[in-house]
UniProtKB/Swiss-Prot annotation:
Residues 229-251 are annotated as: Linker 12. Residues 252-390 are annotated as: Coil 2. This is Keratin, type I cytoskeletal 25. SUPFAM superfamilies: Intermediate filament protein, coiled coil region (SSF64593). Heterodimer of a type I and a type II keratin. Heterodimer with type II keratin KRT5 leading to the formation of keratin intermediate filament (KIF) network. Interacts with KRT6A to form filaments. The lineage of its organism: Eukaryota, Metazoa, Chordata, Craniata, Vertebrata. Residues 1-78 are annotated as: Head. The gene is KRT25. Expressed in skin and wool follicle. Expression localized to the inner root sheath of wool follicle. Residues 79-394 form the IF rod domain. Residues 1-24 are annotated as: Disordered. One of its GO terms (biological process) is cytoskeleton organization. Essential for the proper assembly of type I and type II keratin protein complexes and formation of keratin intermediate filaments in the inner root sheath (irs). Plays a role in the cytoskeleton organization.
Length: 450
């Protein structure tokens, strides 16, 4: 309902489709499609009902005629016809009011049905009973957990097989390296054996040379002895008175003893030199073999430590990779679940916002209809006051205006009442037609004339 003041620049109009109220001087007009006009005492009064819809129902479609009252009196001419017309107008007015109340009741019933259907206990997407889906959801969760566990076990078995293969590969590499090391050691010992064999051959050659020299010396000694024996065995008989000569046998024996002692000494020296060289060479070989064995043991130990560390590193890397895969899979699952929950929350918020918007719109429509009802009740009271106003005959709870009789109306018209109701809704509007402030003033003056 809106109010317009022709004398100022302020206006009121929250909903242009619900009706309008215009004031001109001391009069008021209500209009929204159907009009019924009643000139008042010293003023003009017009009302309109219609174009009010609720749930697809429309009220008011035919205009009602008006009745006039002059300033000199309430009735003029044929009072019976006038009262009949007045009763007809009032009956039509009350029928419109009753239809509006029925539309209001229908709207309330629809709102109640909507709350029963989409209320807090049955709103779609908000409080549905999902208990029947809980076993299915639990079964699906168990299947997902079982599948995830089986997948994790398969991944773990694959990682274990990979680690075992890596361990065997490292063992093979270590054994191969150890085999190559042993072969290199054997080759080194073979070279040492060749050197020793060469030394032995050299010593044997020296021994043979010394043996041949000894044999040659013995042969020369034998030949000299034979020559000396032949020279001493002739028939020369020389007698001389001289000193006794040297005994050649003793001399030869002495020479033989010297040569034998010299040969024995040479043999001993050669044997001692050979033994000394062999001992030093054997000691050097033993030391080299010990150093080689120690170095080989150290190398083997270092390789074993390296193998152990590499196995541990591979195991830790595989564990790290498995944990990263599990973490990535878990994050993906939780992100998917979070996105699903967020989508459900967004859908529920959208439904809740839509429900709130519809509820607020229906609330506003209900308040507007209630305001219209209140204004109509006030208009009925004002109408009753204007036509003589019996307090028991005109009430908003029971509309019995069709039972008015012409005689009663004639009695009521004997005491006319003049009532002026002025309602002002003031709105301050800027240059862009934007409402700044709204104020409502209601002034009512009653006077009774004899």
């Amino acid at each position: 309902m809106s109010l317009r003041l022709p004398s100022g620049s302020r206006r009121a109009g929250p909903r242009p489709t619900t009706g309008s109220l215009r004031l001109s001087g001391a009069g008021a007009s209500f209009g929204a499609g159907n009009a019924c006009s009643m000139p008042g005492i010293g003023s003009s009064f017009s009302c309109a009902f219609g174009s009010s819809s609720s749930g697809g129902n429309a009220l008011g479609g035919n205009p009602c005629a008006g009745f006039t009252m002059n300033e000199g009196g309430l009735l003029s001419g044929n009072e019976k016809v006038t009262m009949q017309n007045l009763n007809d107008r009032l009956a039509s007015y009350l029928e419109n009011v009753r239809a509006l109340e029925e539309a209001n009741a229908d709207l309330e019933q629809k709102i109640k049905g909507w709350y029963e259907k989409f209320g807090p206990g049955s709103c779609r997407g908000l409080d549905h009973d999902y208990s029947r889906y809980l076993p299915i959801i639990e079964d699906l969760k168990n299947q997902i957990i079982a599948s995830t566990t089986s997948n994790a076990n398969a991944v773990l078995q694959i990682d274990n097989a990979r680690l075992t293969a890596d361990v065997f590969r490292l063992k093979y590499e270590n054994e191969l390296a150890l085999h190559q090391s042993v072969e290199s050691d054997v080759n080194g010992l073979r070279r040492v054996l060749d050197v020793i064999t060469l030394c032995r051959t050299d010593l044997e050659i020296q021994y043979e040379t010394l043996s041949e020299e000894l044999t040659y010396l013995k042969k020369n000694h034998k030949e000299e002895m034979q020559v000396l024996q032949c020279a001493a065995g002739g028939n020369v008989n020389v007698e001389m008175n001289a000193a006794p000569g040297v005994d050649l046998t003793v001399l030869l024996n002495n020479m033989r003893a010297e040569y034998e002692a010299l040969a024995e000494q040479n043999r001993r020296d050669a044997e001692a030199w050979f033994n000394e060289k062999s001992a030093s060479l054997q000691q050097q070989i033993t030391e080299d073999v010990g150093a080689t064995t120690s170095a080989r043991n150290e190398l083997t130990e270092m390789k074993r430590n390296l193998q152990t560390l590499e196995i541990e590193l591979q195991s830790l890397l595989a564990t790290k990779h498995s944990l990263e895969c599990s973490l990535t899979e878990t994050e993906g699952n939780y992100c998917a679940q979070l996105a699903q929950v967020q989508a459900q929350i967004g859908a529920l918020e959208e439904q809740l916002h839509q429900v709130r918007t519809e509820t607020e719109g229906q609330k506003l429509e209900y308040e507007q209809l209630l305001d219209i009802k209140v204004h109509l009740e006030k208009e009925i009271e004002t109408y009753c006051l204007l036509i003589g106003g019996d307090d028991g005959a005109c009430k908003s709870g029971g509309y019995k205006s069709k039972d008015y009789a012409a005689g009663n109306m004639g009695n009521q018209m004997k005491d006319p009442i003049r009532a002026i109701v002025v309602k002002k809704v003031l709105e301050e509007v800027d240059q862009r037609s934007k409402v700044l402030t709204t104020r409502l003033h209601s002034l009512e003056e009653k006077s009774q004339s004899n």
